[in-house]
Every structure is written in structure tokens, then in C-alpha cells.
């Protein structure tokens, strides 16, 4: 993997800097590194493809070295270099795509394609290593089963989940009380509702709670907490739990009271925030517990009192809600990130070449299914294909 990254870094620099008119002295070190790459690769044969609809391609390396010049690089010099660069870039692109289409239940962190395995040979160690990539660093750590640390701006750690629970219900579904929520990616929205606006509740207060276990622990998280759940702020028709009927939800939004957010790790409370909105920080957690209340307004104007009568029918439904967004966090596991295209790149390549479903990844790289059942085998394979995708992104946009 280090060889693949070093080749890509050298090629990227060469493509950007070996241009007509450049002083040779400004790129002499790069050209020496480029020539070392050619010397190491010459005489080697590789094969890529052959899985799904990806064509088999054979690669042969027999290129001349770039020479020295006293002055600027001329058009002939650059054209000669470009021919070599383009072949190497095409090779790297195909090696990366070949690697992204393969998976293994055992040793999924190790190279799976023939071409990348061959590059693990001792002779390729002569290529100048550049391990400055976070992904290369973490691939090395994961490969040695050491502690890794991944920084994601918006970690897609929450499997998609959208449902409701009813704490009070009737066959007619005309006086309901409960919670509904949607969890996805890095955002949680939860709403508590009561058709009677807590009229018969103790002290006219309804208590709601929503607990969200994460698939992996997060640390040093920056989080936004808002006293609203906009996805549950408009009328809708909802299928009943048994699927035999539908019921009507017509929310009128109130501000939640006594809001408390707890961040837990292995069942122990690490951070707690009460009635605090905006930006909050969570140090270390694998579970989020949200609790809040719906309080019937003690004083109401006639217009508001008409919204919340003391007896049925209840046309409008009192609703309170919260939105919690994980803006950034550190995670020791491999996760798709809203600010990166790695998952999209891997998925698109696998779709383009109609890669058959293997033993590790779900059909279509369905992220909800993948993160819901996030096994060590899946994590190893994700680490490898995301590393390769990050390498490919240096050369192929």
C-alpha cells in the first residue's frame, strides 16, 4: 500500500510540476525520484481486472529515464515525460479500481489484487516512501492491530432508523401520546407528542426519552443541539404499528422543557448537559440519551386554548422536539464521512463493473446495512478500500 501511495504522490507531483518552461534546477529532486520509480518498475509485468465486468489488462514497464538539462524544460522533454506519466497514472487507476472491487472475510486489511500484492515485494522498497497520508498511517496501524485514530468532520455513524412508539393509544387512534424519531448519518431528530397536550398527565407534564446507541465510540465531539425537530413539524399520515390502518398527525410545536442530554460510555455517564442549546462538547461516548418534557401551558390566550381543548376531538397535537447533530468527532473505526467522497468512489466503481455480491459487503454497499452489522471483517475491508480510494483521488478526480 505504501508503494502505491508513493507512486501516486510522485506522479501527482510530476504531472503538476514537470511543465514547459520550468527551470530544471527547481524540479531536479523530483526528476531523480521519478527516475528511481522508473528503474524500479521497469522489467515488471502486472495484470488487473477480471472481476465482474472489469476487463483484464496487462501492464509492461520498459521506459527510458528522464535526462538532465542546464536550462528550462522544453516541449520535447515535457512530452517525453508526459507519455510515461500518463501510462503510470492509467496503471495506478486500474490497480486502485481492481483493489476496490475485491473483498475477503479473512485478512481483509491486506492487499487483495494480484497487482498490489506484487508491489509488496522487496524490490519495490527502493521506491521513495511518502507516508504523509492519514489513511496510509492508519492503514499501517490497523494492519499491525495497533490503536488507530480517524478524524471525521461528519461521521456517518448512525444507521437510518425512522419509527415511533406509542405510550398511549386506542383502536380509533384519536388520542395518542408517544415519540417519533429519525436517525441517519450524523443527525438525530426526535419528537414527543400528546394529542391532549398533557391534560391528564401528572402536573400536566409528559416526559419523553430517546436513547441512541452508536456502532462505535466517538471522542472529542463537537455537537449542535437545537430545541426543535423540523422533520416532525408538519402534518402527515402514519401507518399504524400493525399495518392495519393509518393515523393522522397534525403537530403544533411547543418548546421542550427540562431538556437533558447524557453521553455515556459503557453505561457510565461521561457528560451531561441540561437546558443548554447550540454547540456542546462530548468527551467520549458510545450512547446518547435525550430526555425532555412537554408541559401544558398554564396560561393560554383563547386562540391557544382552542388548539388544546380539555376533551376530544383533538384536532391539533401538541409536539416538542430536539435535533442533535454530530458536527465533528474522532473515531478509532473506519466510517464514511459526509465531507469525503471515498464511499461514493468505491460504490460507483463496484456498480460500474457490476461486481457480484461477495462475502463481506452488502449489495450496493448499502451503508445502513453495513454499519448496522459492522463486523471486524467489514472494518478491515473498509480500511483497505478507503485507503485505496484516497490514493486514487490524488490522480483521478
UniProtKB/Swiss-Prot annotation:
Annotated region described as Interaction with the inner capsid protein VP2, given as residue ranges: 62-73
Annotated Zn(2+) binding sites: 153
Principal location listed in the UniProt entry: virion
Molecular function GO terms recorded: host cell surface receptor binding; metal ion binding; structural molecule activity
Keyword Ubl conjugation: yes
GO terms under biological process: fusion of virus membrane with host plasma membrane
Mod. after translation: The N-terminus is blocked.
Keyword entries, A-Z: Calcium, Capsid protein, Intermediate capsid protein, Metal-binding, Ubl conjugation, Virion, Zinc
Top-level taxon in the UniProt lineage: Viruses
Keyword Ubl conjugation applies: yes
Coiled-coil parts of chain: none
Binding residues annotated for Ca(2+), in chain numbering: 266, 286
Gene Ontology CC entries for this record: viral envelope; viral intermediate capsid
Compartments (UniProt record): Virion
Family: Belongs to the rotavirus VP6 family.
Functional summary from the UniProt entry: Intermediate capsid protein that self assembles to form an icosahedral capsid with a T=13 symmetry, which consists of 230 trimers of VP6, with channels at each of its five-fold vertices. This capsid constitutes the middle concentric layer of the viral mature particle. The innermost VP2 capsid and the intermediate VP6 capsid remain intact following cell entry to protect the dsRNA from degradation and to prevent unfavorable antiviral responses in the host cell during all the replication cycle of the virus.
Miscellaneous comment: The VP6 trimer contains a zinc ion located at the center of the molecule. The zinc ion is not essential for either trimerization or transcription activity of the DLP. Zinc-depleted VP6 has an increased sensitivity to proteases.
Quaternary structure (record): Homotrimer. Interacts with the inner capsid protein VP2. Interacts with the outer capsid glycoprotein VP7. Interacts with the outer capsid protein VP5*.
Name of the molecule in the record: Intermediate capsid protein VP6
Amino acid at each position: 500500500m505504501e508503494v502505491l501511495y508513493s507512486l501516486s504522490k510522485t506522479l501527482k507531483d510530476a504531472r503538476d510540476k514537470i511543465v514547459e518552461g520550468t527551470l530544471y534546477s527547481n524540479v531536479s529532486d523530483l526528476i531523480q525520484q521519478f527516475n528511481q520509480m522508473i528503474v524500479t518498475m521497469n522489467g515488471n509485468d502486472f495484470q488487473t481486472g477480471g472481476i465482474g465486468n472489469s476487463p483484464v489488462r496487462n501492464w509492461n514497464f520498459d521506459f527510458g529515464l528522464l535526462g538532465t538539462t542546464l536550462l528550462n524544460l522544453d516541449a520535447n522533454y515535457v512530452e517525453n515525460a508526459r507519455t510515461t506519466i500518463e501510462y503510470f497514472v492509467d496503471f495506478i487507476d486500474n490497480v486502485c479500481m481492481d483493489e476496490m472491487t475485491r473483498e475477503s472475510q479473512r485478512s481483509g486489511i491486506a492487499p487483495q489484487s494480484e497487482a498490489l500484492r506484487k508491489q509488496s515485494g522487496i524490490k519495490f522498497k527502493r521506491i521513495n516512501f511518502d507516508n504523509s497520508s492519514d489513511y496510509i498511517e492508519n492503514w499501517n496501524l490497523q494492519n499491525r492491530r495497533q490503536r488507530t485514530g480517524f478524524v471525521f468532520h461528519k461521521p456517518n455513524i448512525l444507521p437510518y432508523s425512522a419509527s415511533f412508539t406509542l405510550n398511549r393509544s386506542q383502536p380509533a387512534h384519536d388520542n395518542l401520546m408517544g415519540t417519533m424519531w429519525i436517525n441517519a448519518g450524523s443527525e438525530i431528530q426526535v419528537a414527543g407528542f400528546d394529542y391532549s397536550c398533557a391534560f391528564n398527565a401528572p402536573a400536566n407534564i409528559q416526559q419523553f426519552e430517546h436513547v441512541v446507541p452508536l456502532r462505535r465510540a466517538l471522542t472529542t465531539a463537537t455537537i449542535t443541539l437545537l430545541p426543535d425537530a423540523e422533520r416532525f413539524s408538519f402534518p402527515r399520515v402514519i401507518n399504524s404499528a400493525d399495518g392495519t390502518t393509518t393515523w393522522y398527525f397534525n403537530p403544533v410545536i411547543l418548546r421542550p422543557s427540562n431538556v437533558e442530554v447524557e453521553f455515556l460510555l459503557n453505561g457510565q455517564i461521561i457528560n451531561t448537559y441540561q437546558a443548554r442549546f447550540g454547540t456542546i462538547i462530548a468527551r467520549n461516548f458510545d450512547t446518547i440519551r435525550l430526555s425532555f418534557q412537554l408541559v401544558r401551558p398554564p396560561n393560554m390566550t383563547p386562540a391557544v386554548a382552542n388548539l388544546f381543548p380539555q376533551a376530544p376531538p383533538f384536532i391539533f397535537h401538541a409536539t416538542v422536539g430536539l435535533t442533535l447533530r454530530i458536527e465533528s468527532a474522532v473515531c478509532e473505526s473506519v466510517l464514511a464521512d459526509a465531507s469525503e467522497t471515498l464511499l461514493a468512489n468505491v460504490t460507483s466503481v463496484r456498480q460500474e463493473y457490476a461486481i457480484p455480491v461477495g462475502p463481506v459487503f452488502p449489495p450496493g454497499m448499502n451503508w445502513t446495512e453495513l454499519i448496522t452489522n459492522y463486523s471486524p471483517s467489514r472494518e478491515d475491508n473498509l480500511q483497505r478500500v478507503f485507503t485505496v480510494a484516497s490514493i486514487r483521488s490524488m490522480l483521478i478526480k
